[in-house]
Amino acid sequence: MLLGSTNTLRISSHGKEWEGKTLTGMPLGKVNQRVKVPASDSEGAITSKIKEMLSKVGLSVSSYDTAWVAMVPTLDSSKQPLFPKSLNWIMENQQSDGSWGLDLQHPLLIKDSLSSTLACVLALQKWNVGQQLIHKGLDFIQSNIWAAKDEHQHSPIGFDIIFPSMIEYGRDMGLNLSLNQSLVETMLLKRELETKSLKDKPSNLAYVAEGLNRLNDWKEVMKFQRSNGSLFNSPSSTAAALIHLHDGKCFEYLNSLAKQFGNAVPTIYPFDIYARLSIIDTLEKLGIDSYVSEDKERVLDDICRCWMQGSEEIFLDPTCCAMAFRLLRMNGYAISSDALANFDEKEKLLHTKDIKAMLELFKASQLEICEDESALCRIYAWTSNYLKEELVNGEIPDKSLQAEVDHALGHPHASMERKEIKNFIENYNADKVSLLKTSYRFCNANENYLLAFSFRDFNMYQSMHREELDDLERWVKQYGLDKLKYARQTIRSAYFSITSSLFQPNHSDARISWAQNTVLTTVVDDFFDFSGSMEELLNLIELIERWDEHTTIGFKSKEVEILFNALYGSVNDLADKAYIVQGRCVKRDLIDIWIILLKTMLKEAEWARDKNVPGMDEYIENGYISFALGPVILISLYLMEPLSEEVVTSKEYDNLFIHASIIGRLLNDRVTAKREFAQGKLNSVSLQVVGSNGAITEEEAKEEVTRIITSHRRELLRMVVQTEGSIVPKSCKNLFWTMSKLLHLFYMSEDGYSSPTKMLSAINAIVNEPIVLP
């Protein structure tokens, strides 16, 4: 990862790669205090606080970087500090134990304290001030120098190069460090080995330029100077360059920091883009971004402008670039993935063991919307392999990040949003600290407050969801659907499938529709497959076609009567609700959706009866409809927001449905091929094998099915994120994408929908088990 990431980083024990991880588990009450959202806080008050966080994010002061800035002499004399206010800040901000740095008291951040303290001591010694402070600082270093060789300590980036070099600087200044000579020699040797290991990585060496002293080729270092005059947006690296070269652009950069921050500087600047992206990402993961949707859009508008202008802050940082790409693309911004080609190989990253960067790149790589985005395919391949290796080898010590990586790898293209929100809330470390060359944290992003609010928000919604599920279970019994012994009983899975993503209170009717129609399509499908005679199937279709005149027809069996009454009562009820939303009667539309579905199911029943084997194209043309997403999605959409006749009859609307349905049909076929073949049912996998007369194996057929799924998923996502020329409302398009992610979840390795026990823990987590925070 480059600057701006929220990871903790350290030099690996092999001295070849910089590894990313996030610090968690701050042990002291001072750091771990929970913030409660007052019960009296209105939604407006809560929203106001979140808006404030989005408007501007501050970063903690860096004693380490401030010390390097304080060491810069005036350009016309080496006897005066160029930034005397920074020197004054150092003199006023020593901790009681003699150290400098964030007062975290974290037992694994002693190397960070050593580095910051020695840098501050050097600044004081250079200008011959604060002798008492120097002595206290040296006492701290001498008492804690053991941590410098402790591999269990979290190491700031470049510590093994910079810290021993600062010891040499101190000796040259006449400091009496009183350190064990053997230990110092060991550190110097390690520095040499580390430096040699990075000789073919000039950017890595340039980033820790302050630790290379006379060994450094400063002209080579300055090749990495950015347009704002900095080296890697790092005040310490830039200060070191200014000390040696008196570069005008370096001076302008540091002078701008002095004007903006006054006495002390952060460890990275600028950082605004990444910080605001991080807060938006956190709001989405906590499930509370809808409270500030307009502010979120304004922030993303700003970031999109920066993207279009080629911002170095975005494009030179893989974590920032990948996150910006993901959030912008999924929120409908027309941006190219070309920028990510800079990271399509692991070796192109500055820090090649940065887990957070790898994870962000992995997530971004799954957002392919056209065939020529080959860079995304390459990124997906190498990041997935790398993350799997790190996970298997136990190389991700942060448990929260480890869980996130494990989930991401296990659920590509799949999602149950509400369960992920709950996991994120339960594992969220609101007090996380990040580490570049020194530790830092966002100082005005009250993440404890966000955590407490999301906790309250989740449990409030969950109570509402439990009531809805109770109503649905009564509905099943009301129509006698539980008496259909041949049918799968799926009300919990059906409700879970939509509640996991469409959870807001204003979508209650849409959720009810989704769940009811999921149950109805399931029992009807089972009736057509296993229980109903051809006479009964035709009877049911005729009843639906006649609708209000059904009493003149009669029922061929009790099962037909139960099914029709459930359909008739439920569709009429949903049509009445849809009338309120649409301002017009759409009952005929809802009935026609069911008739179209039943006729495709009938065709498959006729194929089975007559032992006809259709071609692949004919099978898919019929099968995407018989997969039965029509009543589930299309009727629910009528209950979400007004949809004009132009929208529901448009080619765009139709294609969204087709792509989602084909994805579902083929995902189901891929995991049920053996079972359905044994049952004598048609399947896209078995059709290929049979149609080729054995020339195609089952595995090859599954690979072809996977290729088709990928193509339709890519096209579906393109349509979902596209805004130009689109007439389908964004929330409606998102529901098709939600269905795709749910289908990938249900059919990852087996038919999870037909095996509700596989989803039992997730169902309970979302509907029955409230979040309990310590």
UniProtKB/Swiss-Prot annotation:
Annotated residues for binding of Mg(2+) 1: 525, 529
Cofactor(s) needed for function: Mg(2+)
Free-text remark on how the cofactor is bound: Binds 3 Mg(2+) ions per subunit.
Pathway participation: Secondary metabolite biosynthesis; terpenoid biosynthesis
Renumbered ranges of motif DDXXD motif: 525-529
List of residues binding Mg(2+) 2: 525, 529
InterPro entries, per database record: Isoprenoid_synthase_dom_sf, Terpene_synth_N, Terpene_synth_N_sf, Terpene_synthase-like, Terpene_synthase_metal-bd, Terpenoid_cyclase/PrenylTrfase
Protein name in UniProt: Ent-beyerene synthase KSL4, chloroplastic
Species: Ricinus communis
